[in-house]
Amino acid sequence: RLATLKMEGREKSAIATPHGLIPLAAVNRRFDRTWPTDTLELITSGGLKDLTAWYIATGRQALETMTDDVVSANALRPSPLYRRPRKIWGIGLNYADHAADLSEKTPTGIPGSFMKPDTTLIGPGDAIRIPDLSQKTTAEGELGVVIGQQCRDVRAEDWLTMVAGFTTIIDITAEDILRQNPRYLTVSKSFDTFFSFGPQLVTPDEIPDVSTLEVSTVLNGRVHAKNVVANMTFSPAFLVSFLSQVMTLLPGDIISTGTPGACVIADGDIVECRISGFLSLVNPVVDFKGPGKK
């Protein structure tokens, strides 16, 4: 499990252990390794595969000797896992219950999908900003799939070999803009701060069965909606396979697989994405239209 922390003015990778986070730079020094300490570079270079293999073979035990290198997550600010993915794919209405929330039908043959710019991206604890142009903004907890290698025309049964890991995501929508016209989907999804990403990347070896993961949208500590991955209309396996038939997928590309339900957010709210076995992603909400918020 990887996290990204802001250390000495730079965002660097760290490995999660039972004792806390150990900077990857410290691991490199201790074990004479050269893994990239930037999380996106670690993925794109193929270094994450080597790091995972080392961790499974001997690294998990070896890290137990590095308690002096553990940094407190409270002492350093967590960051998004990385900031410049080549692609952010979002999947809409992938749970029937969420489609009903919007008085829509779940797509059948082809998943409803959209893309988001990387300027939407924020990390744990960063403020989600409700923009002037929206009077009704919603937040959605989602499972994120991070692609681990360049791939095209992936068979569904091979999907997991193309995945670097999984993470928690909060996707934001200016719902009132979307409801005006479905062609406004891209605009409604593309405001700054409308995609929170992190705090940990969980590699596939840590998850016995992705389909059993429970995904929840939580508002102010109360579960607004939850469902399990098995109930998705389009499974993560299908999504990786299908999207790879549309375009080449690249290391670090993100697929946000859809939400069990969206909640309307307002100034002062706390939004959370919970996924069973994952560290939760939490973000406060600020409304730009509030007094003194400009």
Language-model segments: residues:
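Short acidic-glycine loop/turn motifs at beta-strand connectors
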Residues: 7-9, 16-20, 147-149, 219-221, ...
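Non-heme Fe(II) oxygenase catalytic core, chiefly the N-lobe of the double-stranded beta-helix
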Residues: 119, 124-159, 169-172
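A generic local secondary-structure boundary/capping motif
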Residues: 3, 77-80, 101-104, 128-137, ...
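Catalytic-pocket segment enriched in acidic/His residues
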Residues: 56, 71, 75-77, 98, ...
